[in-house]
């Protein structure tokens, strides 16, 4: 009986609960000062055209806290860190399940690990 109940409960869970969400960042390991950094976030397990969905870019400089950079929402609303907004552009390609961040005029102070996240 316990096995049957577990199976029935599993079958009644909506399929979106069982899907695995993954996000993977790609881009150059290094850029030179004054160059433009272009990073791509390729994701699966959700659709950025679904109401309420959003993807953010964050970074973490060595030995420092996380810093939020930018966010794009399902309806193409865009939000940027006030201190970096003149250097950042975020865009999405829902057909490829990708979000792209570009950051102009790179500087050594921009040294960090860059992450995308569904937040």
Swiss-Prot record:
Pyrrolidone carboxylic acid modifications at: 20
Species for this entry: Homo sapiens (Human)
Signal peptide (UniProt feature, chain positions): 1-19
PROSITE patterns for the chain: IG_LIKE
Localization of this protein: Secreted; Cell membrane
Primary location class: secreted
GO molecular function: antigen binding
SMART domains xrefs: IGv
Stated name of the protein: Immunoglobulin heavy variable 2-70D
Region described as Complementarity-determining-3: 117-119
Region of interest (Framework-1), ranges: 20-44
Taxonomy of the source species: Eukaryota, Metazoa, Chordata, Craniata, Vertebrata
Function summary: V region of the variable domain of immunoglobulin heavy chains that participates in the antigen recognition. Immunoglobulins, also known as antibodies, are membrane-bound or secreted glycoproteins produced by B lymphocytes. In the recognition phase of humoral immunity, the membrane-bound immunoglobulins serve as receptors which, upon binding of a specific antigen, trigger the clonal expansion and differentiation of B lymphocytes into immunoglobulins-secreting plasma cells.
InterPro entries reported for this sequence: Ig-like_dom (IPR007110), Ig-like_dom_sf (IPR036179), Ig-like_fold (IPR013783), Ig_V-set (IPR013106), IgHV (IPR050199)
SUPFAM superfamilies (UniProt xref): Immunoglobulin (SSF48726)
């Amino acid at each position: 009986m316990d096995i049957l109940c577990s199976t029935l409960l599993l079958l009644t869970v909506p399929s979106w609960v069982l899907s695995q969400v993954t996000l993977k960042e790609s881009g150059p390991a290094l850029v030179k000062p004054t160059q433009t950094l272009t990073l791509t976030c390729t994701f699966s397990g959700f659709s950025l055209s679904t109401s309420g969905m959003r993807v953010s870019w964050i970074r973490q400089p060595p030995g420092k806290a996380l810093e939020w950079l930018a966010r794009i929402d399902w309806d193409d609303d865009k939000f940027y860190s006030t201190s970096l907004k003149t250097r950042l552009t975020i865009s999405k390609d829902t057909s490829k399940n990708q979000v792209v961040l570009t950051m102009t005029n790179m500087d050594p102070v921009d040294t960090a690990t860059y992450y995308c996240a569904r937040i």
